[in-house]
Amino acid sequence: MSTIFSAEFAGRNISIKTGYVAGQADGAVMVIYGDTVVMVTAVSLKTAREGVDFLPLTVDYQEMTYAAGKIPGGFFKREGRPNEREILTSRVIDRSIRPLFPKGYCYETQLVATVLSVDSENDSDVAALLAASAALEISDIPFKGPIVGVRVGRVDGQFICNPSKLEQEKGDLNLYLVGRKVVPGTEGRPYDVNLVMLEGEAQQVEEEHVIAGIDFGLECMRPVIELQDQLRSALGKPKREFEAVEIDDALLAEVSEKAAVRMREAYRMSRKLDRHAALDEIRNSVLKAVTADEAGLRLRTAAALEALEKRIVRDVILKEKQRIDGRSYAEIRAISAEVGILPRAHGSALFNRGETQSLAALALGTSSDEQRLDYVAGEETRSFILHYNFPPYCVGEARPLRSPGRREIGHGNLARKALMPVIPSPEEFPYTIRIVSEILSSNGSSSMATVCGGLLCLMDGGVPVKGVVAGIAMGLLKEGEQVVILSDILGDEDHAGDMDFKVCGTSKGITAMQMDIKIDGINEDILRKALAQAREGRLFIIDKILATISEPRKELSIYAPRITTVKVKPEKVRAVIGTGGKNIRQIVSETGVTIDVEDDGTVTIASSDMEASARAIAMVRWLTEDAEVGKIYRGTVKKVVDFGAFVEILPGTEGLLHISQLAKERVNKVTDIVNEGDEVIVKVLEVDKQGKIRLSRKEALGSDI
């Protein structure tokens, strides 16, 4: 029997329906938001895999094409590998729920979110996050929810909860935030809503406005949090008992006695590879003492070693008031950069921050190089593309090269969002822009190095960017009332810390953000401090970028295509293309240019050879030229009739050469002067209101073209 719980969410009804689908899953719900319907199932195994001391969580979000009444393309006519949107949404759900499972819960867990119906107004990712939380809430899987995801936009200075696609496009702020109920509340409230996950993009919006948008979004969540409370109270199963991977005090004390001093010495090594080599040696020496038949003890010992490492890193920062590489809390690592290092790329930069290094390369193309994405909710075309690569050698590993994983796609998407607000419009810069960031060395904040390197290679390539963007990763350590915020975190600080908060922007404001936390949530005070400290760091990095290259180059690379845009009348587009593409193929064949023709009459010609471009432009103008009264043309006789001949003076443009205009003397028969296929010089006498053209041969005789 199905049960439905409903509430108002952003002025629209939202319903959670459960009890009649996927009955063998531990938890299964449907969320209905307008005509958007998402089903999420949650299953967690009852026995843990041997040797696993972490949460093996998998989240798969999939959009079925039938959800929008479509049939998939391709030979097999079925859904294939997840697209970028599906991967990014899977990551959002994963990052939101992962920190809310109990410590020591190491049972394989899978959530599958299936979009069954989609409309153009209600975001399926908002519905999917709610369904994921609700499925876990009613299941017996241990989970510290409920959580709610909400999108916040801002149009004309007004915040909007769950804006439509049109409102998102019009706005200057687009946040996706996830909040969690925290009991008891402050200021007399029964509960607070703390931030669990955040990502967003903005048009250089100031920090205060971003914080106001987050506060607005957290308040919007309350009706749906209470809706889940009703659902759990009515239908929730008792949470299962489980055997946690625990570290007893005696084992931790024993491991600490054997390894703590050496670990502290290792964490004084500033170079990552030296530090990790020393730590590996310490771990191996401790684990060797555990015999093979004591598998459970070996696992607990490994967990104790990891806990000890985290404790040491946190103690150094919280108690000794310094970081493992000797920096102060707000200090940025040493930065160096250079541009123009790849001769044939259209722009390039090498950006170094500490031991993190990004090689960013730029390629410019035409509109035919745009990325076309076909999603269930509609198509998207991108003229700015950014790809992030994280090869194994950048962290000193050797493993097979694979296609980009979820992490690489997520980092590339974040860097693209960060740079997008300063990319010139197609009218200002009619190029397709592709940046590739190769991470050559990584010790934290590689996605932020991609932002900085990407901006540098744009400037090196002569792209007229609207501002200078930099990115910085902020960390957090929180114990009781003690809160420490770190700027430009190392990989080890990220691993031992409670937050990874990436903030990108210009000197004017924020362009993109992404926050992941490992604790139950953060409040506004921590968020405000982190953003203020991030701004200081961002401005410092911007100064370093400007010291490398102060403004975009005035000229493009000599190897970049030169794009010229010619406007023709829309009715002349067919003349440019020609029958079966004959004319456009001829232009390409004779000049070697790349040419694109839009239905609105925009003709784009691209070539690194300016003479070839000039020839192609002349051919286009000739193909689309209008007949000019008084001008002499060399035409071809297309048809002969009793009263004259029809002469093509321009491609697709014919005029009437009357028998009386053939010669100065009287002509009795048209074919005495001209026949079909003859070339003839004529003068345009008149173009009437209907576009009909009168020609004269006798007035053109003796004239030169």
Curated annotation (Swiss-Prot):
It catalyses: RNA(n+1) + phosphate = RNA(n) + a ribonucleoside 5'-diphosphate. It is found in: Cytoplasm. The keyword Ligase does not apply. InterPro entries: ExoRNase_PH_dom1, ExoRNase_PH_dom2, ExoRNase_PH_dom2_sf, KH_dom, KH_dom_type_1, KH_dom_type_1_sf, NA-bd_OB-fold, PNPase. Keywords: Cytoplasm, Magnesium, Metal-binding, Nucleotidyltransferase, RNA-binding, Transferase. Its cofactor is Mg(2+). SMART domains: KH, S1. It is an enzyme of class 2 (transferase). Residues 630-698 form the S1 motif domain. Residues 561-620 form the KH domain. GO terms for cellular component: cytosol. Mg(2+) binds at D494, D500. GO terms for molecular function: 3'-5'-RNA exonuclease activity; magnesium ion binding; polyribonucleotide nucleotidyltransferase activity; RNA binding. GO terms for biological process: mRNA catabolic process; RNA processing. Its EC number is 2.7.7.8. Its main location: cytoplasm. NCBIfam families: polynuc_phos, PRK11824.1. Involved in mRNA degradation. Catalyzes the phosphorolysis of single-stranded polyribonucleotides processively in the 3'- to 5'-direction. Belongs to the polyribonucleotide nucleotidyltransferase family. This is Polyribonucleotide nucleotidyltransferase. It comes from Syntrophus aciditrophicus (strain SB).
